[in-house]
UniProtKB/Swiss-Prot annotation:
K(+) binds at residue 58. Catalyzes the formation of S-adenosylmethionine from methionine and ATP. The reaction comprises two steps that are both catalyzed by the same enzyme: formation of S-adenosylmethionine (AdoMet) and triphosphate, and subsequent hydrolysis of the triphosphate. SUPFAM superfamilies: S-adenosylmethionine synthetase. It comes from Mus musculus. S-nitrosylation of Cys-121 inactivates the enzyme. An intrachain disulfide bond can be formed. The protein structure shows that the relevant Cys residues are in a position that would permit formation of a disulfide bond. This is S-adenosylmethionine synthase isoform type-1. Disulfide bonds join 35-61.
C-alpha cells in the first residue's frame, strides 16, 4: 500500500491499484532555469543568422555573475552580452534589491569552436539526412492518455501553477512576487490495466520569492485563491487535500543569490516529472545534431502519435545512438500492457512511419528554427505550439 512516509495508513489508498505520484516544476527565476533560458537564447541568436550553427552552450550563474562556456561553430555574429542581459531582463531580475540585476551583472564568455574530431565524424562532407549523431546516448519519449496533452497530470499542473504565478507577477496583480518559484503536486491515481487514472490531488506545495512587504498569511491566501483555484480543476480538490504554501515561511533571497545555477540540472522538470524514464542528457543550449535533444523530441513525437492513434493508452519509447552513426542503434517500445498489439507489431508501425536519423528529425520537426528559448521553461512537452506535439497520422 502507498502512503505517507510516517507510515500512517491512508485509507483512500487501500483500494487495489491505488497509488500516489509526485512531480515538481520551477519558475523562470529559478537559478538553474535562468541558465537554461540563457543557453537557449544563445542557441536562438545563432540560428537566426546561421541555421546550420553547431552549438553546445552551457551557462553558470551566481550573485552578480553569468558565465557562458562551451563550443560553438557558426558564421553568426552574436553579441553575447546583449543576449544574456536581455534574457535576464525578460525573466524579471532588473534590480539589485531582487538579488540580481541585468544591468550590473558581470558576463564572462568562455566559448570555443566545436572539436574538429567531432565535426569530421558527425556532419562534415555529409548530406543532411546522413548527418551522424553528435554523441552516443539513450533517449526516452513518454505519453499517457490521462490528459488531453498526453502528459502526466502531476507535471501538467506543476507547470501551470508556475505559469500562473509568473502571469500574476508580470501583470502587477501580485506586485510582491519576485521571479523565483517552485511548485510540487502529488496526485492519487488508480491503475487501469496498465493505464493510470487521476483520482484526486493529495498535496500541493508552492514556494515563491517575495519582497519584504508582504505577510505570510497574505501570501498563503493569494496562492490558494488566485493561483491554485485558477489553475487546478475543482474536481481534483477536496477537504483532505494538503496545502504547503510558503512552507519555509520566508523566501526573500532567491534566484542566483540564493543558489548557484547551472544549465541542464532540471531534466526531470523539462520532461515527464519522473514518469517514464530519462537517459540523462539535458536539452538547453544544444543544436539538433545533439541527439540528447532532437531524439528526445522525436521519441516524444512517436509516443504521442501512438497514443493519439489509439494503439495504446500509455507508452514509453527508447532510442539509442552512437557518435557519427546516423541510424539509431535500437528502438524499444513499452506499453505497460495497454495495447491490443504486441510491442513487436508496434515497433513495425514506428519503423514504417518514422525515420529517426538526426538529419531527418531536423527536417520533420523543423529544428533549425530559433524556437528554443520558449522551450526552456514550463516543460518541453505537452505544449501545442511545438512540432513534436502534433501527432503524426500513422499508416498501419
Amino acid at each position: 500500500m502507498n502512503g505517507p512516509v510516517d507510515g500512517l495508513c491512508d485509507h483512500s489508498l487501500s483500494e487495489e491499484g491505488a497509488f500516489m505520484f509526485t512531480s515538481e516544476s520551477v519558475g523562470e527565476g529559478h537559478p538553474d532555469k535562468i541558465c537554461d533560458q540563457i543557453s537557449d537564447a544563445v542557441l536562438d541568436a545563432h540560428l537566426k543568422q546561421d541555421p546550420n550553427a553547431k552549438v553546445a552552450c552551457e551557462t553558470v550563474c551566481k550573485t552578480g555573475m553569468v558565465l557562458l562556456c562551451g563550443e560553438i561553430t557558426s558564421v553568426a555574429m552574436v553579441d553575447y552580452q546583449r543576449v544574456v542581459r536581455d534574457t535576464i531582463k525578460h525573466i524579471g531580475y532588473d534590480d539589485s534589491a531582487k538579488g540580481f540585476d541585468f544591468k550590473t551583472c558581470n558576463v564572462l564568455v568562455a566559448l570555443e569552436q566545436q572539436s574538429p574530431d567531432i565535426a569530421q565524424c558527425v556532419h562534415l562532407d555529409r548530406n543532411e539526412e546522413d548527418v551522424g549523431a553528435g554523441d552516443q546516448g539513450l533517449m526516452f519519449g513518454y505519453a499517457t492518455d490521462e490528459t488531453e496533452e498526453c502528459m502526466p497530470l502531476t507535471i501538467v499542473l506543476a507547470h501551470k501553477l508556475n505559469t500562473r504565478i509568473a502571469d500574476l507577477r508580470r501583470s502587477g496583480v501580485l506586485p510582491w512576487l519576485r521571479p523565483d518559484s517552485k511548485t510540487q503536486v502529488t496526485v492519487q491515481y488508480m491503475q487501469d490495466n496498465g493505464a493510470v487514472i487521476p483520482v484526486r490531488i493529495h498535496t500541493i506545495v508552492i514556494s515563491v520569492q517575495h519582497n519584504e512587504d508582504i505577510t505570510l498569511e497574505a501570501m498563503q491566501e493569494a496562492l490558494k485563491e488566485q493561483v491554485i483555484k485558477a489553475v487546478v480543476p475543482a474536481k481534483y480538490l477536496d477537504e483532505d487535500t494538503v496545502y504547503h504554501l510558503q512552507p519555509s515561511g520566508r523566501f526573500v533571497i532567491g534566484g542566483p543569490q540564493g543558489d548557484a545555477g547551472v544549465t541542464g540540472r532540471k531534466i526531470i522538470v523539462d520532461t515527464y516529472g519522473g514518469w517514464g524514464a530519462h537517459g540523462g542528457g539535458a536539452f538547453s543550449g544544444k543544436d539538433y545534431t545533439k541527439v540528447d535533444r532532437s531524439a528526445a523530441y522525436a521519441a516524444r513525437w512517436v509516443a504521442k502519435s501512438l497514443v493519439k492513434a489509439g494503439l495504446c493508452r500509455r507508452v514509453l519509447v527508447q532510442v539509442s545512438y552512437a557518435i557519427g552513426v546516423a541510424e539509431p542503434l535500437s528502438i524499444s517500445i513499452f506499453t505497460y500492457g495497454t495495447s491490443n498489439k504486441t510491442e513487436r507489431e508496434l515497433l513495425e508501425v514506428v519503423n514504417k512511419n518514422f525515420d529517426l536519423r538526426p538529419g531527418v528529425i531536423v527536417r520533420d520537426l523543423d529544428l533549425k528554427k530559433p524556437i528554443y528559448q520558449k522551450t526552456a521553461c514550463y516543460g518541453h512537452f505537452g505544449r501545442s505550439e511545438f512540432p513534436w506535439e502534433v501527432p503524426k497520422k500513422l499508416v498501419f
